[in-house]
Structure formats: C-alpha cells, structure tokens
C-alpha cells in the first residue's frame, strides 16, 4: 500500500511539474491513440475479425453502474458475478474460462499470474471511460497469452476539458456512493482525476463491501514529444459468503488491491508510426476462510509486473505491416504458491494486403512468445519431471480474409492458433482438497470464424459463426472420492457457436433520440470424456443468451433506458432480468433512478451464489465548467 501511494505521489508530482511549465504559445494536444490494439488500425466495420465497440453514449445511457454490469449487456460475453457492484466477477468470452480472457486498459495488459479470478479487479469507473473495444476469437496472435477466447480493451477519456463533477447515490442494501471528477486544461497539458467510494451492508449475510477507486490521467509534453500517463488504484474489502469453496462456506472474506501506472507516446516519421509504452501493474489478494478467525486459514498473494511494449506500423507497397514486441518481468510472493519469477518475450508481425480495388483484404500474421519458467512436454499428463521437458517458444500463426461487396457490406473469415499458460494457482496451489501440478503445459486451440458485417448510417448488423477446437485444457480430476483434486491437462473441448448483433438509432422530432441494440448468442460444447472417474470441470457456459437495450428521450430533459437479459446455462433453467433507468437534467444537475431486477427473478450466475432480487438506486450529479 505504501509503495503504491508513493508511486502515485511521484506520478502526480511529476505531472504537476510538467503542467506548471508555461509556454508562451499555447499548444493544442493531438489525440494520442495509445491502444486500441497493437495491430493495424482500421475501422472496426472493416476489420476481418469480430470487433464490437461500446461507445461513450451507450455507457452514459446504460442502466449499469460498473463495468461488470455493462459487459453483461453484450451477447457473447458472460460476466458471472458473486454479489453486487462487481466486487467479485469473472469474465468469459464465447464459452471459454475466466483464465482465457484478457483485459487491457489503454492497451496495457492487466492479466494476473495468480488466477483469472482477479482479472476484473483492475476495472475503472464508468466516468473515466471513452469507449470499450471487444475482440472475440483467437486474439493471442495480437495480444499474447490469456487472449485465448478474446480480449477487452478499456479506453480512457481523451478529450479532457475544464470541468468538475460531483455525484452522490444511495439505495437498497444500505448502499452509499460518492464520486468526484476533476478535469483541468493547462497551456501545454491537461489532467483528469477521479475518486470513487462505494459501500454497502450487503444483500444477505456476509456480503457487505467497501470499495475505493482512484484514477489519474494526464497528457503533457517533454521536449515537444507528447506523452500520456495513467495511474489507477482499486481497493476492495468484501464478505464472500459462498463465493469460493462451497455454498456452505458462509464466513469467507477477501481484500484485494489492484494498481497500474503506465506511460505511452507516438513517434511518426513519413510512413512509419511507432507506439511505445512502459507500465507497472500490481495485485494484492488476502483471503481468509473464517472472517471471525483468520488464523484458521489465510492466504496472502502479491504480484508485480513491469513491462515495456513497442508496436510499429509501416506503409509499404503491399499495404501495411504491423510489428510488435512486448517484454515483461512478473513476480509473485505468496504464502501458499511460493516465490515466483517469470520473464516473458512476445513478438508478432502481420501484413495487411489489399486486392481488386481494395475489395479483398488478406492479413497473415504470426506471433512467438517465450516464458522463462514454463516448459513443453511430450507427456502433458506427467506429474514428474523428465527428459521430455523443453523450454521452447510458443509459435502461433493466423490469417484474416475479408471481401467488401460495397462500403456497407463485408464478408469476413479468419483462422488462427491461440494459447493460455497455466496460472500459478493451477501449478502450485495446495490445500487438503486441491493439489496443483507444476508440470502443466499450456492450453491451445485452433479457432476459425465466418461472419458478415453491414453498416448503413444509423443501422449496423453483424453475424458470425465460429468453431474452437481446444486441447490440453486444464481440469481437476481424481479416481477415488477420498483423493484430493489434482490439476492435469486432460480435456479436449470443441465449441461451436454463432452470434447476432444489431443496432439502430433513429429520431422522433427534433431532439428525441431512440436507440435499440439487440444481441443473441448460442453455444454448443462437445466435451471429450476422460479416463478419470471424477472430474471437477463442469461446462456451465451460456447455452443461449439474448440481450437488448432500448434508450429513448422523452424530451430535452428526460431520458430513459430499458435493459433486457435472457439466459440459459447448460443443465439449468433459463432466467430473465429486466433493469430500468431514467434521468432528469435541470441546468447543472442530473437526477437518476435505477431499478434493477424489476421482475424480482431468482437466479444465480456462478457457484450457487444467489443474486439479489428487486433493488433500486437513486443518485444526483452536479457538473460545472
């Protein structure tokens, strides 16, 4: 905690010093596109992969108050919450696992080496988000490991103006919230600071929480070179009734801290664009089995990752060449998982080519990743070291193909290899009931997709069908009931699915805006049986999923949104959840009322943790320039 606060203080002092330097001539900062993916930058509708963007307008209109709720409104995404306000949530894409999804902030990877359960610890307040880009499919070629089924990139606000806003809210379960956002422009720079505080007594026994979030962003110049810096800190303390272990474990408790600091810039020279970034990411997790008596069972894990990434785009006679290199060092200190140290090197290259007056585009690519502490084995089921182990780079190629019938309609297809290395929990976790396996090899899959994209003025439509053949998937197995679960690479899973998304924006009168978004997904898994008598791996993906939002303006001051979710998991009954939000604007004030689960549906999303019934939240926001 002290190291984190010191880092943020140093960052703030450094930025303030830069800001304080005055220039005689005011400099207009250009937009710095620090992300959006490391690959070739083209409009999402023209990409030959599955890309969906949640705009700032959609975020503002949404019934969601956090990213977990927001992503639940997208077909093909499965955010499984334990409790409210996203205190603990797992992120799944297209039926994969929570360890197979990568989260990024402004292009900085925030995966956790301990476990994918911590992926959503580093999410940001909605107030500081410009948009969210969602890449589905084999994304490891672009982003590296963990992007097994896709990647989600949170892009922070770029347009920073002179503005201060305050917000207060309260509601069911004794929820209390407060936030302040300060945006300030200077002669040659700008800065955005946001602080959020949320707390609740919980919607049932031992589900109370306290959550503090701090975010800073600044654009400034050093010797006429534009630099963007970000820093974020998220502190959570929450009761975890039935969150892990079993539903009978009602007295669990957890505290997590996640933080990130990053700097990025852009160099342009003729036909070359270079985008370097430097970053540090930290996560701390303290878990106790009995909140009243931590000495019974307590785990403490602290991970740190320092990295540098450089991506480049080069125009050439064939089209555009994308190159990238990512070097990082990750450490973990844990009373259960031990002391771990990992060096990682990831390089990738892809060449986009266009033919027939740019109607046909072809993008082959390849990526190579090396981990200092992970080997391959000729026998993935082995639990003992042998001469068959070699520490070699992982190589995974892919290719994208698209055909534009016209400016509105595109047919696309892609195929590529993807992978996910085991977490330290998979390898080294030890308890009376579960034993890791340090000799696990990486999961791998071949993913292919065929889809169409149609975009016309205020209407857009996408449809895609995909196949993922995964092997060496990690499962926990045993032959006798009295034995502990042991991790092994024994699963083979073939996943077939399709998705449909449609958006339409229209106007009634001179100011009444209406926007409808509809999504549908279907997943079918074919799980190969194993030789073991007992398996802990249970397919629980969303078999069918329907999402819909309808936002509309009654007049220039009143706007409302209805969010609909219908889902059915394998071997479970389907459920429907309906949320509603209405806002009233008067001068500098905005009053909002959110009604969640209006139908009072009884349902669970994971681990038999019941979600709350009908609940409400009332908030007020004051903004001044």
What are these regions (language model features)?
Residues 245-268, 387-400, 404, 410, ...:
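Outer-membrane beta-barrel signature, preferentially recognizing the C-terminal barrel domain
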Residues 150-151, 156-184, 194-195, 200-207:
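Short strand-turn segments of transmembrane beta-barrel domains in outer membranes
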Residues 68, 72-108, 112:
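Extracytoplasmic beta-strand/coil segments of soluble accessory domains associated
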Residues 109-136, 155-157:
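Short acidic/polar hinge/loop motifs at secondary-structure boundaries
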Residues 200-207, 211, 225-305, 332-339, ...:
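Flexible loop and strand-edge segments within Gram-negative outer membrane beta-barrel domains
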Residues 315-321, 356-357, 362, 467-469, ...:
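Gram-negative outer-membrane beta-barrel transporters
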């Amino acid at each position: 905690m002290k190291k984190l606060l010191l880092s943020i203080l140093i960052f703030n002092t450094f930025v303030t010093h830069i800001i304080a330097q005055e220039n005689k001539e005011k400099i207009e900062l250009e937009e710095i596109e620090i992300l959006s993916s490391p690959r070739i930058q083209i409009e999402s509708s023209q990409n030959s992969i599955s890309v969906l963007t949640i705009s700032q307008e959609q975020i503002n209109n949404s019934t969601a108050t956090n990213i977990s709720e927001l992503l639940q409104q997208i077909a093909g995404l499965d955010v499984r919450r334990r409790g409210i306000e996203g205190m603990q949530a797992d992120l799944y894409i297209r039926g994969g696992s929570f360890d197979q999804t990568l989260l990024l902030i402004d292009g900085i990877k925030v995966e956790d080496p301990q476990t994918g359960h911590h992926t959503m610890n580093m999410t940001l307040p909605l107030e500081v988000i410009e948009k969210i880009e969602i890449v589905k499919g084999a994304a490891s070629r672009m982003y590296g490991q963990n992007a097994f089924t896709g990647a989600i990139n949170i892009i922070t606000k770029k347009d920073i103006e002179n503005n201060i806003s305050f917000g207060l809210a309260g509601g069911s379960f004794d929820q209390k919230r407060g936030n302040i956002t300060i945006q300030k422009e200077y002669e040659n720079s700008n800065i955005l600071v946001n602080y959020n505080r949320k707390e609740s007594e919980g919607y049932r026994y031992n589900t109370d929480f306290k959550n503090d979030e701090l975010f800073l962003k600044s654009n400034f110049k050093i010797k006429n070179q534009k630099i963007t810096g970000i820093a974020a800190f998220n502190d959570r303390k929450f009761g975890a009734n039935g969150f892990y272990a079993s539903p009978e474990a009602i007295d669990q408790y957890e505290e997590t801290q996640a933080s990130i600091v990053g700097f990025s810039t852009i160099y342009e020279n003729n036909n070359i664009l270079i985008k370097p970034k430097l970053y540090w990411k930290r996560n701390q997790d303290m878990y106790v089995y009995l909140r009243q008596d931590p000495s019974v069972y307590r785990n403490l894990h602290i991970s740190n990752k320092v990295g540098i990434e450089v991506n480049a785009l080069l125009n050439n006679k064939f089209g555009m060449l994308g190159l990238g290199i990512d070097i990082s060092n990750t450490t973990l200190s844990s009373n259960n998982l031990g002391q771990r140290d990992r060096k990682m090197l990831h390089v990738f290259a892809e060449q986009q080519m266009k033919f027939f007056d740019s109607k046909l585009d072809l993008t082959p690519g390849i990526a190579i990743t090396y981990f200092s502490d992970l080997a391959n084995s000729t026998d993935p089921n082995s639990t003992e070291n042998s001469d068959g182990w070699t520490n070699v780079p992982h190589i995974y190629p892919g290719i994208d193909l698209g055909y534009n019938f016209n400016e509105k309609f595109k047919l696309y297809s892609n195929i590529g290899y993807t992978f996910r290395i085991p977490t330290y929990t998979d390898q080294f976790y030890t308890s009376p009931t579960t034993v890791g396996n340090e000799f696990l090899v990486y999961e791998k899959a071949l993913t292919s997709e065929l889809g169409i994209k149609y975009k016309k003025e205020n209407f857009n439509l996408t449809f895609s069908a995909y196949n993922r053949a995964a092997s060496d998937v990690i499962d926990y197995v045993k032959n006798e009931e009295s034995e502990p679960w042991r991790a092994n690479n024994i699963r083979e899973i073939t996943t077939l699915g399709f998705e449909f998304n449609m958006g339409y924006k229209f106007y009634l009168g001179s100011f009444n805006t209406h926007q409808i978004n509809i999504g549908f997904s279907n997943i079918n898994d074919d799980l190969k049986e194993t030789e073991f008598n007992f398996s802990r791996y249970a397919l629980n993906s969303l078999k069918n999923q329907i999402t819909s939002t309808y936002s509309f303006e009654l007049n220039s001051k009143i706007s409302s949104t209805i969010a609909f979710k219908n889902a059915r998991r394998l071997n479970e009954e389907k459920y429907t959840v309906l949320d509603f939000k209405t806002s009233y604007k008067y001068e500098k004030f905005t009053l909002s009322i959110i009604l969640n689960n209006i139908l009072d549906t009884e349902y669970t999303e994971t681990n038999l943790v019941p979600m709350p019934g009908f609940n409400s939240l009332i908030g007020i926001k004051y903004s001044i320039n």
